[in-house]
Amino acid sequence: MLPAVADHYNCEEIPEISISAPDDKMVVHVCEAADRAFTFLSRYELHPQKPISVEIIEKLIYLDGYWAIGMYDGSSERLFMMSLPTLLETGFLPEMYGQPFDEEHYIGAVAHEITHAVFQHNASDVEDKWNNAAQEYLAHATQLGVLSAQRRKEIISSEGSGPWESGDEISVTYMGFNPTGFAVKSYLHLTQLNDPQPFIQILLNHKWLYVSVP
């Protein structure tokens, strides 16, 4: 069987995004995710600094010892995302944040990867192994932030976590242990900051395995 030939698409009102996909089924989802992510991140004066190329693929991604549905590769400035139909068919990710994985959560997952791109556009001397915690904090906060208000309320209520507090250490270890709690704590912490810019700068200039909350 010959591989599908990818076509190229653009988001009508988001020139920073270009999409390569076998067909146009995922274009609306990607454009919606980009719009929501850029809107959320703009509140924190974070904007894309260069084009983001999104490639819709039909297989899982093997990344640093585990399988993923999406990733942003800063070296090539390309974002890879598994298509929603293929993802649902494989049953690889039946739930997201304790809820059945569906179109809304797919948009959130795409927004998560777009946030990695925007983070790397704005960060100083990005080295993934050293600033994963900072990137994931922002990516999960955005992923939760772009969901519908009702979905977000249900997730926060079900998890029962409060925001990160002064003295806490934000780490990918905690994220791996409790991704929903990590997302809830990150979203609540970020959105409740009276002046978020100093903390945003901590994230963008972060060079360690965990982030200490001031």
PLM-predicted stretches and their roles:
Residues 87-110, 130:
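Short pre-active-site segment immediately N-terminal to the catalytic Zn-binding motif
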Residues 149-214:
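Long, well-structured alpha-helical subdomains associated
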Residues 122-131:
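Short helix/strand-bridging catalytic loops that position acidic/His residues to coordinate divalent metals
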Residues 108-121:
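Active-site recognition of the HExxH zinc-binding catalytic motif
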Residues 1-4:
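Gram-negative bacterial Sec-dependent N-terminal signal peptides
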Residues 26-87, 103:
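Auxiliary, metal-adjacent structural segments of Zn-dependent hydrolase domains
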Residues 7-25, 84-95:
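Acidic/histidine-rich, surface-exposed loop or edge segments in extracytoplasmic proteins
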Residues 130-162:
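Post-HExxH zinc-binding segment in Zn-dependent metallohydrolases
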